[in-house]
From Swiss-Prot:
Biased composition (Basic and acidic residues): 61-75, 92-106, 130-145, 216-241
Gene Ontology CC annotations of this record: extracellular region
Keywords linked to the UniProt accession: Cell wall, Peptidoglycan-anchor, Repeat, Secreted, Signal, Virulence
Lineage of the species this protein comes from: Bacteria, Bacillati, Bacillota, Bacilli, Bacillales
PANTHER family: TOL-PAL SYSTEM PROTEIN TOLA
Ranges of residues in domain CNA-B: 602-714, 715-824, 825-935
Signal sequence region: 1-52
Organism: Staphylococcus aureus (strain MRSA252)
Skewed-composition ranges (Low complexity): 109-126
Name used for this protein in its record: Bone sialoprotein-binding protein
């Protein structure tokens, strides 16, 4: 089915059809593989939808329960043909026997009627009774009694299975899916693809009555015309004669969703300015909708397609009109009286003309819009569908169909054929959908019961929503109806002299006898089922059924209803014949385009794209070859411009508007998954493939031989194996297992990811459905593993690494492997020690430092571990991968970093932060050392300024035993190494007034052990008069090297007679700075803040300036004073003695 009432916006020059749906009825056949394709898909009436049901079904438990007597089936010789593949180009032969005729023999039993009704597996034993003709009362014969309490029919076992079968319907139902047709979307392809259609009808000719004809069953098989003659004679045949009719083989059309517009038909108001004379018809044709065989299968819904291409003269103005006429024997809608024609539109959907339809004259009048005022050289196209008007053609006949656009006519001769009844023994029935009311959602079905006027015993007709196969089997089809107590069912008897129209459509029921009240009608026979009990009959009857249907989605019609006739044959077995009708839809289309400039005579090129299954480059050499739709075909003009179309459902493409003498290039895009077939595989230019690109020159005619073929590109696989390479040799060993859940990524040659998978429990992986080409395979390293070495041996046994390239060239590639081994773990660390000798080396006597915090960072600077040294100063970090790390030592409080990198790496200190790289081994060389600051070294800075002018009278008794060894070098730069052992016990009472300013700088490194007790009382800047009596026993050994810068002014008056009045004025400038490093720490007082370039503190003179001369004077003065004191003490000692 093509576009339905769609308006597409495409390029100006293109052609597109504007579609509109209509309805038709179709006799349905199930089990065939026929497909209806063409420019439009006609909906219709379907029958025999489950024709091959018995070929595919099996006995079920329900069938066994429903059968107690032997069931002898007669299967026709065409049973195997029902599932045979249908060739679209070969029609089915006429008068073939159908497998749908099933004969169920009923064995006599002793059961009563009540038993039959209560037990589905029991049948009564009775002999056939004689039935009078024209007896329409319901039969009470036990043999033919139908149990109306059961909903569905029992499925009959095929192939002469011996089963006892009653006439009681069972609960088993055949599920059959009919084959659906393809739907064409190419609006320019007016040639429908033919499909097998049913032929050979068997009905009574109302216009040619004849005498009764006696004919045997064999004669009917061999001479189908005998059956037609039998129907037309309307005679009573011998009861032993069993007419056989060919089961229809028409296709089951695809259900179509379509937009449907209906309106009450009104005569077209033809505008006064008809411009038919300004319309130039360039092409028009009449084609058959199903099969181009000259036969219209009217009951199969076969439609007539009228296409017309025409040009609109530039003189046409808005408001002008043109006409399109249908043949009087056709009608736009088969089962409705309402029809609105499609609009003529351009490719963009803009309306060129709007139409109205006159049902009385069967003429469309199109009125042009202002489109014709705005564009020149407007081209238009119409595609109209119609059906045989059964009112005008009640019986089979030959017709000359004539259609016309703007009074330009075209004709085609066709033969109209109608359906024949389905016959099984005395059961013979046929039906059609005769009317559709989309407003009330009602459908009318007209059923011919016993149209052959056979002597039918115990006749029952069942009407069912859904499908009924020719053999009477029920199935779920393409649609449904609602059958309940509100369903209208009328029964009419056909008099012996009356003829039934072969069209199966009754326009005036009043001409037949209404016997509705003379038969038993059960409208609740089952779910959506009704039953009519006719009893014994030998006349034809018409049943009119008006049932409701439930509409589907927008414009979606799926209406299907079947009927089944059941009779008792001469063997007291039930015989069934079934018929099914279905409603589908079809569309009309109209389209056009406009061009700016007039064009010269133009030509077209194109033809066909097909799937070349056998790859030989020749069309039609393999039955599986088929057309390829939607293949992009590009036309390149001489000036380099291009335009493209896609192939339709029939593989057809076409470019029009081409100029004579010009050269064009046609290129075919290779569909995804296909490859171009062999070029020029034969000398027949109509059958070969021209390749992906072909150049053609227009030589005064169309060229419709530019074909190309493609075949499906073969698909391949790629992959193999991921394993644990325990021995790390890069070779797959037999005892090495696969690794599960390894992620593998596949990329194409452009780097695009086209697939991802994981290895299975065996380590296997694969990628499927791949084309030839180059691919990249990437393996993700599993957690805890390391890639093994790659490319060590044969391609199928080595490791290809983490990333590898796989090439597919007309074969699978199973060589892409990757191996991994479990990643080892490493440790790092060592030692933090107390470097007592500060040499930056670990000595055997030096001990570790406990509780030093050590931090480990990874290459990104992230902390991955922290620990503390143990009591031996040891630390370590474990479970480390190879990589770069940083170790950070936190300096202990009160300690100083020792020197780094002074000796071997495992014995020196590496400092507070150490970068380390682990490569497949532990690293225990990361050490660090610290030492303690020597705060016991005496650092004495003394600044004393003493200015004394005193008169001191001192009486001192001093007993001193002192052993002093002093080596002192005092200058601005002094280095003193003193080792003294002094034991002093002195009692000194000194009252002195001293003004002293001394600057002493001493830098000494000494190791001393001293015990000193000093009591000093100093009053600076004092004037003291002391009278001192001193008795001293002193032994002093002093080695003093003193360089003193002192300024001493001494005025001393000494009386050697133990009475000494000394007036001493001493000015001393002394700066003493002592820096001592000793094992014993003694606190010292700070020196003055002023120091020289040797870092010696200096005292400033009171004047604020430095005076070396004054210092020297002080030195000498001090010496003299000392000598004087010695003399004085010595004299007094003598006196005392």
């Amino acid at each position: 089915m093509i576009n339905r009432d769609n308006k597409k916006a495409i390029t100006k020059k293109g052609m597109i059809s504007n579609r509109l749906n209509k309805f038709s009825i179709r006799k349905y056949t199930v089990g065939t593989a026929s497909i209806l394709v063409g420019t439009t898909l006609i909906f219709g009436l379907g029958n025999q939808e489950a024709k091959a049901a018995e070929n595919t079904s099996t006995e079920n438990a329900k069938q066994d329960e429903a059968s107690a007597s032997d069931n002898k089936e007669v299967v026709s010789e065409t049973e195997n043909n029902s599932t045979q593949k249908n060739d679209l180009t070969n029609p089915i032969k006429k008068e073939t026997n159908t497998d749908s005729h099933q004969e169920a023999k009923e064995a006599p039993t002793t059961s009563s009627t009540q038993q039959q009704q209560n037990n589905a597996t029991t049948s009564t034993e009775t002999k056939p009774q004689n039935i009078e003709k024209e007896n329409v009362k319901p039969s009470t014969d036990k043999t033919a009694t139908e149990d109306t309490s059961v909903i569905l029919e029992e499925k009959k076992a095929p192939n002469n299975t011996n089963n006892d079968v009653t006439t009681k319907p069972s609960t088993s139902e055949i599920q059959t899916t009919p084959t659906t047709p393809q739907e064409s979307t190419n609006i320019e392809n007016s040639q429908p693809q033919p499909t097998p259609s049913k032929v050979d009808n068997q009905v009574t000719d109302a216009t040619n009555p004849k005498e009764p004809v006696n004919v045997s069953k064999e004669e009917l098989k061999n001479n189908p015309e005998k059956l037609k003659e039998l129907v037309r004679n309307d005679s009573n045949t011998d009861r032993s004669t069993k007419p056989v009719a060919t089961a229809p083989t028409s296709v089951a059309p695809k259900r179509v969703n379509a937009k449907i517009r209906f309106a009450v038909a009104q005569p077209a108001a033809v505008a006064s300015n008809n411009v038919n004379d300004l319309i130039t018809v360039t092409k028009q044709m009449i084609t058959e909708g199903i099969k181009d065989d000259g036969v219209i299968q009217a009951h199969d819904g076969e439609h007539i397609i009228y296409t017309s291409d025409f040009k609109i003269d530039n003189a046409v103005k808005a408001g002008d009109t043109m006409t399109v006429k249908y043949d009087k024997h056709t009608i736009p809608s088969d089962i409705t009286d309402d029809f609105t024609p499609v609009d003529i539109t351009d490719p963009s959907g803009e309306v060129i003309a709007k139409g109205t339809f006159d049902l009385n004259t069967k003429t469309i009048t199109y009125k042009f819009t202002d489109y014709v005022d705005r564009y020149e050289n407007v081209n238009a196209k119409l595609e109209l569908n119609s059906y045989i008007d059964k009112k005008e053609v009640p019986n089979e006949t030959n017709l000359n169909l004539t259609f016309a656009t703007a009074d330009k006519e075209t004709s085609k001769n066709v033969k109209v054929e109608y359906q024949k009844p389905i016959v099984k023994d005395e059961s013979n029935i046929q039906s059609i959908f005769s009317h559709l009311d989309t407003t009330k959602h009602e459908v009318e079905q007209t059923i011919y019961v016993n149209p052959l006027k056979l002597n039918a015993k115990n006749t029952n007709v069942t009407i069912k929503s859904g499908g009924v196969a020719d053999n009477g089997d029920y199935y779920t089809g393409d649609g449904s109806t609602i059958i309940d107590s509100n369903t209208e069912i009328k029964v009419y008897k056909v008099a012996s002299g009356q003829q039934l129209p072969q069209s199966n459509k009754i326009y005036d029921y009043s001409q037949y006898e209404d016997v509705t009240n003379s038969v038993t009608i059960n409208k609740n026979y089952g779910t959506n089922m009704a039953n009519i009990n006719f009893g014994d009959i030998d006349s034809a009857y018409i049943v009119k059924v008006v049932s409701k249907y439930t509409p589907g989605a927008e414009d979606d019609l799926a209406v299907q209803q079947g009927v089944r006739m059941t009779t008792t044959n001469k063997y007291n077995y039930s015989s069934y014949a079934g018929y099914t009708n279905t409603i589908l839809s079809t569309t009309d289309s109209g389209g056009g385009d406009g061009t700016v400039k007039p064009e010269e005579k133009l030509y077209k090129i194109g033809d066909y794209v097909w799937e070349d299954v056998d790859k030989d480059g020749v069309q039609g050499t393999d039955s599986k070859e088929k057309p390829m739709a939607n293949v992009l075909v590009t036309l390149t003009y001489p000036d380099g411009t291009t335009k493209s179309v896609r192939t339709d459902a029939n593989g057809h493409y076409e470019f029009g508007g081409l100029k004579d003498g010009e050269t064009y290039t046609v290129k075919f895009e290779t569909p995804a998954g296909y490859l171009p077939t062999k070029e020029n595989g034969t000398t027949d230019g109509e059958k070969d493939s021209n390749g992906s690109s072909v150049t053609v020159k227009i030589n005064g005619k169309d060229d419709m031989s530019l074909d190309t073929g493609f075949y499906k590109e073969p698909k391949y696989n790629l992959g193999d194996y991921v394993w644990e390479d325990t021995n790390k040799d890069g070779i797959q060993d037999a005892n090495e297992p696969g690794i599960k859940d390894v992620k593998v990524t596949l990329k194409d040659s452009t780097g695009k990811v086209i697939g991802t998978t994981t290895t299975d429990a065996s380590g296997k992986y694969k990628f499927t459905d791949l084309d030839n080409g180059n691919y990249t395979v990437e393996f993700e390293t599993p957690a805890g593993y390391t890639p093994t070495v790659k490319n060590t041996t044969a391609e199928d046994k080595d490791s290809n690494g983490l990333t590898t390239t796989g090439v597919i060239k007309d074969a699978d590639n199973w060589t892409l492997d990757s191996g991994f081994y479990k990643t080892p773990k490493y440790s790092l660390g060592d030692y933090v020690w107390y470097d007592s000798n500060k040499d930056g080396k670990q000595d055997s006597t030096e001990k570790g430092i406990k509780d030093v915090t050590v931090t480990l960072q990874n290459e990104k600077g992230e902390v991955i571990g922290t620990t503390k040294t143990d009591e031996n100063g040891k630390y370590h970090f474990d479970n480390l991968d190879s990589g770069k790390y940083k170790v950070i030592f936190e300096k202990p409080a009160g300690l100083t970093q020792t020197g780094t990198n002074t000796t071997e790496d495992d014995k020196d200190a590496d400092g507070g932060e150490v970068d380390v790289t682990i490569t497949d081994h532990d690293d225990f060389t990361l050490d660090n050392g610290y030492f303690e600051e020597d705060t016991s070294d005496s650092d004495s800075d003394s600044d004393s300024d003493s200015d004394s002018d005193s008169d001191s009278d001192s009486d001192s008794d001093s007993d001193s035993d002192s052993d002093s060894d002093s080596d002192s070098d005092s200058d601005s730069d002094s280095d003193s190494d003193s080792d003294s052992d002094s034991d002093s016990d002195s009692d000194s009472d000194s009252d002195s007034d001293s003004d002293s300013d001394s600057d002493s700088d001493s830098d000494s490194d000494s190791d001393s052990d001293s015990d000193s007790d000093s009591d000093s009382d100093s009053d600076s800047d004092s004037d003291s008069d002391s009278d001192s009596d001193s008795d001293s026993d002193s032994d002093s050994d002093s080695d003093s090297d003193s360089d003193s810068d002192s300024d001493s002014d001494s005025d001393s008056d000494s009386d050697s007679d133990s009475d000494s009045d000394s007036d001493s004025d001493s000015d001393s400038d002394s700066d003493s700075d002592s820096d001592s490093d000793a094992g014993k720490h003694t606190p010292v007082k700070p020196m003055s803040a002023t120091k020289d370039h040797h870092n010696k503190a200096k005292a400033l003179p009171e004047t604020g300036s430095e005076n070396n001369g004054s210092n020297n004077a002080t030195l000498f003065g001090g010496l003299f004073a000392a000598l004087g004191s010695l003399l004085l003490f010595g004299r007094r000692k003598k006196q005392n003695k």
